[in-house]
Amino acid sequence: MIDFFLKSEYLPAGDQPKAIKEIENSILLGNKYQTLKGVTGSGKTFTIANIIKDLNRPALVVSHNKTLAAQLYREFKDFFPNNAVEYFVSYYDYYQPESYVPSKDLFIEKEATINTEIEIKRIRTVTSLAKRRDVIVVATVSSIYALGSPDFFKKSAREFFVGQKISIKEISDIFVELYYERTLMNLERDKFSIKGDIVEIWPSSEHGEFAYRICLDFDEIVEIYRVSSFSKKKLGATNSFTLFAKSYFVIPYENVLEAIPKISHDLSLQCQYFKDNGRLVEAERLKQRVEYDLEMLRETGFCSGIENYSKYLSGSTMERPYCLFDFFPKDYLLFVDESHVTLPQFRGMYNGDHSRKLNLVNFGFRLPAALENRPLKYDEFEALINQVVFVSATPGVEENEKSSVVVDQIIRPTGLVDPEIITRRSDGQMEDLYSEIQKRVALKERVLITTLTKKMSEDLTEYLVNLGVRAKYLHSELDTLERVEVISLLRKSEIDVIVGINLLREGLDIPEVSLVAILDADKVGFLRSTTSLIQTIGRAARNSNGLVIMYYDKISLAMREAIEETNRRRQIQIDYNEKNNITPKTIVKKIQNILEKELNNKNKNVGYDFEKIISDERLSKKKLIDKLKFDLEEAVNDERFEDAIVLRDKIKELSSKISIARNKKREV
């Protein structure tokens, strides 16, 4: 078994060694629940990485949104370069679920746009879990949604090796059995090609980097190469490779045949139920829809909406559907990041899904079995937990009550202390805020301002810009790339102030920010709860000059609790620094994007070079632009937005050069 190897220039420091030891001891004692209560900037991710390395177990790290999941994914990829670090989030760019609105007698067909790159990562996740133990998966709430049987997926594995006695036809039959399609055109993902004694296949779990080329001689594999999926350049020889089904929804055809009579039986029962209750329209509707699906299953082994028949097709006797948790070995570790937000998400998924599908069943659009294609109920999720570490700066009641140990991680390795908090009356707040911004700008530091509404953030930004402040607003109506560009501008000192709403809470890591201003800090509500205020205060905790100003009319209970907790932590940190003669230092975080190194590696692997690309006549320019677009899509899906911006600009530059070259040829 391959061990987890943690790569880092640093050793655990501050409260990290204590936290690592206490949590590991609790886990080794067999306790199911533990909580890491770590302040912002205390290195909670590094603590998790050390626990995974020391206990040497597969791990699932769950976050509450794609952006933070991608952040964690990148960090764990850096920490564990020699191990399998995977990313499992929803693969829908757009999703309109099948639904029925009785009040309008309106049936809405399912519509979805699937993000190919995220789908690849999901397949790669289950493939890694089927092949090895040294796996870390970073996921979102998608981890509790229905998947296919892990046993069926593992049994789909087929190995190909040099010296294997096998014919081209046998290889082709295996590929088809694993849901791959043959192509006579250019090789694409999920397809294979046959040319003479050479077979090439592009596995579904590969990110477009390479395909496999199998060379045969008289029904024997003599060579296997990895080749670039785009340039077909050889990347290296290998003695063998294992291929899994192209989808994690693996359904053996015998299961389809066994399911058909069961579906027919339940159809008869449900139609009779409708007729007995005088609902002939629903009975006829259900009969027509299900009989059409049955005909498709008989003919092709597949039908539209096949997931609604997963109860029959999976062969499972469980009352719940399979999900990502079932692909893990029994001794895996679960880490719930920002648990105060993530756990309520897990708790709420089932009810919304169930009420929508119940309408479909009650009005004859689906059989009752469709209700079993669903996210897990909360108690089902809890039953699948082996051992868990809740991770949050502000853990909720559930985490505190269930955990055998709640470990504080207050001391930061950098010596940074929680920011000082000043409260000021809201009278004259605009003039006061402008004055504070000027002080920070003079020191070449940055400012975050949080408001309650989008309109307020836009109006305040306009007000500041009119005063000559370099400011931009940040809220959910900006698309992902636009939001990242705004943050990038702040970090690069091209603007000094960001005005936002809820986007300034968990996970926004900008060490240049020394002032966080909270307007309407006393207003009662989600955005000004104790937890939200503490999280917002944490945005100023990565700078040695960190300061938070709360503007208020009347100090609220949430304000008082947030201030008391922050001051408690701050005093502990100051005392520790004085005792150990530590001078706090602002975190230095590189502004440049991580694309440069990755592109250098990709240039070596896939055969293109930005500097030589125009003059290289051996390669198709269109194919090279397609490759860059592929990388751009991958960067966006990985939430590597600064990388995506560089790639986007490079595509524009390259397209422009090609256009100029074409025009010159026309002139000649």
From Swiss-Prot:
Its main location: cytoplasm. It holds the Pfam family Helicase_C. It is found in: Cytoplasm. One of its GO terms (biological process) is SOS response. PROSITE patterns: HELICASE_ATP_BIND_1, HELICASE_CTER, UVR. SUPFAM superfamilies: P-loop containing nucleoside triphosphate hydrolases (SSF52540). Keywords: ATP-binding, Cytoplasm, DNA damage, DNA excision, DNA repair, Excision nuclease, Helicase, Hydrolase, Nucleotide-binding, SOS response. It comes from the Bacteria. One of its GO terms (molecular function) is helicase activity. Residues 429-595 form the Helicase C-terminal domain. Gene3D superfamilies: P-loop containing nucleotide triphosphate hydrolases (3.40.50.300). Residues 25-170 form the Helicase ATP-binding domain. Residues 622-657 form the UVR domain. Belongs to the UvrB family. The beta-hairpin motif is involved in DNA binding. The UvrABC repair system catalyzes the recognition and processing of DNA lesions. A damage recognition complex composed of 2 UvrA and 2 UvrB subunits scans DNA for abnormalities. Upon binding of the UvrA(2)B(2) complex to a putative damaged site, the DNA wraps around one UvrB monomer. DNA wrap is dependent on ATP binding by UvrB and probably causes local melting of the DNA helix, facilitating insertion of UvrB beta-hairpin between the DNA strands. Then UvrB probes one DNA strand for the presence of a lesion. NCBIfam families: PRK05298.1 (NF003673), uvrb (TIGR00631). This is UvrABC system protein B.
